[in-house]
UniProtKB/Swiss-Prot annotation:
<dbReference type="Pfam" id="PF00673">
    <property type="entry name" value="Ribosomal_L5_C"/>
</dbReference>
<dbReference type="GO" id="GO:0006412">
    <property type="term" value="P:translation"/>
</dbReference>
<comment type="function">
    <text>This is one of the proteins that bind and probably mediate the attachment of the 5S RNA into the large ribosomal subunit, where it forms part of the central protuberance. In the 70S ribosome it contacts protein S13 of the 30S subunit (bridge B1b), connecting the 2 subunits; this bridge is implicated in subunit movement. Contacts the P site tRNA; the 5S rRNA and some of its associated proteins might help stabilize positioning of ribosome-bound tRNAs.</text>
</comment>
<dbReference type="GO" id="GO:0005840">
    <property type="term" value="C:ribosome"/>
</dbReference>
<keyword id="KW-0699">rRNA-binding</keyword>
<dbReference type="Pfam" id="PF00281">
    <property type="entry name" value="Ribosomal_L5"/>
</dbReference>
<comment type="similarity">
    <text>Belongs to the universal ribosomal protein uL5 family.</text>
</comment>
<comment type="subunit">
    <text>Part of the 50S ribosomal subunit; part of the 5S rRNA/L5/L18/L25 subcomplex. Contacts the 5S rRNA and the P site tRNA. Forms a bridge to the 30S subunit in the 70S ribosome.</text>
</comment>
<keyword id="KW-0689">Ribosomal protein</keyword>
<dbReference type="InterPro" id="IPR002132">
    <property type="entry name" value="Ribosomal_uL5"/>
</dbReference>
<dbReference type="InterPro" id="IPR020930">
    <property type="entry name" value="Ribosomal_uL5_bac-type"/>
</dbReference>
<protein>
    <recommendedName>
        <fullName>Large ribosomal subunit protein uL5</fullName>
    </recommendedName>
</protein>
<dbReference type="GO" id="GO:1990904">
    <property type="term" value="C:ribonucleoprotein complex"/>
</dbReference>
<dbReference type="InterPro" id="IPR022803">
    <property type="entry name" value="Ribosomal_uL5_dom_sf"/>
</dbReference>
<keyword id="KW-0687">Ribonucleoprotein</keyword>
<dbReference type="GO" id="GO:0003735">
    <property type="term" value="F:structural constituent of ribosome"/>
</dbReference>
<dbReference type="GO" id="GO:0019843">
    <property type="term" value="F:rRNA binding"/>
</dbReference>
Amino acid sequence: MARLQAIYRDKLVPELIRQFGYSSPMQVPRLSKITLNMGVSEAVSDKKVMDSAVADLTRIAGQKPVVTKAKKAIAGFKIREGQAIGCMVTLRGVQMYEFLDRFVTVALPRVRDFRGISGRSFDGRGNYNVGVKEQIIFPEIEYDKVDALRGLNVSITTTARTDEEAKALLAGFRFPFKN
């Protein structure tokens, strides 16, 4: 069992029941999935860029990503329908908790000029999105072997009904929110 999964079961569930007055432990919000998405606009002109992006995301997530393709052609961006434009991976279960642990304790503190993450990035339904500007903040990525700095989006999907419940859940996982 992952460290954060044990913290959730032993400490967070009773704490959230007390805080929000749930009648059953099954009402307590929990993480359902974490999706990592990397848009690779340079892949339009150079196919090798997509291979290195897939390799980076594989190292970060510990699981092979799916290459996302354009749904329709956009002439202004020189994109044709079906062309590879990014990659994404969905984490669930133990891998999700392991990634979240590394993200909060190792990767986020390595961000330059880090002062906490915004508490405004909730979507109104209890899900949280955070953008990472450089993939080199993850310890799995070797700085010398990086061909280009790429950002990625981390979407944390919870079963929480409100943003307040989701923020309490993520704060219990020691998310460094700004005050």
